[in-house]
Regions:
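Short, acidic/turn-prone active-site loops that include or flank metal/cofactor-
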Residues: 1-3, 22-25, 86, 106, ...
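Phosphate/diphosphate ligand-binding glycine-rich loop within oxidoreductases
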Residues: 1-50, 175
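Glycine-rich NAD(P)-binding loop of Rossmann-like domains
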Residues: 39-75
Length: 226
């Protein structure tokens, strides 16, 4: 993403900022399932786990990553649901995915919810006690989006009350030590890992080079974010 770029200042100085959407989407989607299999098999602690076949997976935000998650989920035989405030329901359903009316419905209906929303003023800390609390028994929350979308104190409170819930992420929370107390129900990679594959890095580098060349060749700003 471009969360670390001061978009407003760049615009003020007439600096063009672009991103390379979709270049790491498969890498992130594959990691979602790496985390998910780890969680449903009880973090390989020797105890019997569960299977993904027939489980309901909810995807919050149906962009490049969300669509790849849906593609992989179908291979596991999962029922896939999605909600995206900016993607029409008929577009979602045209890909063989059930579209729901709102994020509350997504959390209520699904066994597992995978987050793919950006960190915006509207989404920051929106994944909170009330929302996650709607999940079914033995629900699993996966975050490969941004840590800012999680209301950490409220999720900690909920996990303390509901010992059936699991939370896995590739973004180390600020309250990692507190989450770690939920042994067997929480896992975080040491650093952001979703896009860290050789293929994703190559794809992003090539895409960036092409965009820079296009900008200087004919002023193309197709992927401008400011």
């Amino acid at each position: 993403g471009y969360d670390n770029v001061d978009i407003a200042y760049a615009k003020e100085k007439n600096v063009v900022v672009e991103n390379t959407p979709g270049q790491n989407s498969n890498a992130v989607a594959e990691l979602v399932f790496g985390l998910l299999v780890y969680a449903v098999r009880n973090f390989y602690n020797g105890k019997s786990g569960t299977e993904l076949l027939g489980k309901k997976l909810g995807i919050l935000a149906y962009g490049n990553v969300g669509r790849n998650v849906a593609r992989i989920a179908k291979g596991f035989g999962m029922e896939v649901y999605a909600y995206d405030a900016f993607c029409p329901k008929d577009v979602i359903e045209s890909t063989g995915v059930h579209a729901v009316d709102n994020q509350d419905a997504l959390f209520e209906q699904c066994d597992i919810v995978s987050l793919h929303i950006p960190a915006t003023p509207e989404t920051r800390q929106s994944i909170n006690y009330a929302l996650v609390g709607k999940m079914k028994k033995n629900g699993i929350l996966i975050n490969t989006a941004r840590k800012e979308v999680i209301n950490e104190p409220e999720l900690i409170k909920l996990m303390a009350e509901r010992t059936d819930l699991k939370f896995v992420t590739d973004i180390k929370p600020d309250a990692d030590a507190e989450f770690a107390a939920f042994e067997g129900r929480y896992f975080s990679t040491p650093k952001k890992m979703g896009a860290q594959t050789a293929e994703a890095n190559t794809n992003a580098g090539i895409a960036a080079a092409k965009q820079i060349n296009a900008f200087f060749a004919d002023g193309c700003t197709k992927f401008r974010v400011n």
